[in-house]
Amino acid sequence: MGDAEKGKKIFVQKCSQCHTVEKGGKHKTGPNLHGLFGRKTGQAEGFSYTDANKNKGIVWDEGTLLEYLENPKKYIPGTKMIFAGIKKKGERQDLIAYLKQSTSS
């Protein structure tokens, strides 16, 4: 899929202001992402989601994240995630490779 090392740099630049990935990491503006893969939208315990996120009902995996990260507001209209998205597919694949590695250990 992607390159996790490159993905880590993308995460630090574009995601870490609002998200953490480590087990037991705190929620920031966005939820902690540990355990993301295989979880339904809007399910990180202790984070206040919009109804749009809670009701989307998809399960996060490589495919859903690839689509979501391109344009979050288009994928989940009503999400409070203000990030515009990552247009380059390769960058999204690198980020997903990093997330897969960092959110499951």
Swiss-Prot record:
**Matching InterPro entries, A to Z?**
Cyt_c-like_dom, Cyt_c-like_dom_sf, Cyt_c_1A/1B
Q: What happens to this protein after translation, modification-wise?
A: Binds 1 heme c group covalently per subunit.
GO MF annotations in UniProt:
electron transfer activity; heme binding; metal ion binding
Gene Ontology CC: one annotated term: mitochondrial intermembrane space
- N-acetylglycine occurs at G2
**Alphabetical UniProt keywords:** Acetylation, Electron transport, Heme, Iron, Metal-binding, Mitochondrion, Respiratory chain, Transport
Residues bound to heme c are: C15, C18, H19, M81
- Which compartments is it annotated to reside in? Mitochondrion intermembrane space
Residues annotated as coiled-coil are none
Checking SUPFAM superfamilies in the record gives: Cytochrome c
Keyword hit for Transport? yes
Chief location category: mitochondrion
Q: What does this protein do?
A: Electron carrier protein. The oxidized form of the cytochrome c heme group can accept an electron from the heme group of the cytochrome c1 subunit of cytochrome reductase. Cytochrome c then transfers this electron to the cytochrome oxidase complex, the final protein carrier in the mitochondrial electron-transport chain.
The UniProt family comment states: Belongs to the cytochrome c family.
Q: What is this protein called?
A: Cytochrome c, testis-specific
Query: Which organism is the protein's source?
Result: Xenopus tropicalis (Western clawed frog)
**Gene name as annotated:** cyct
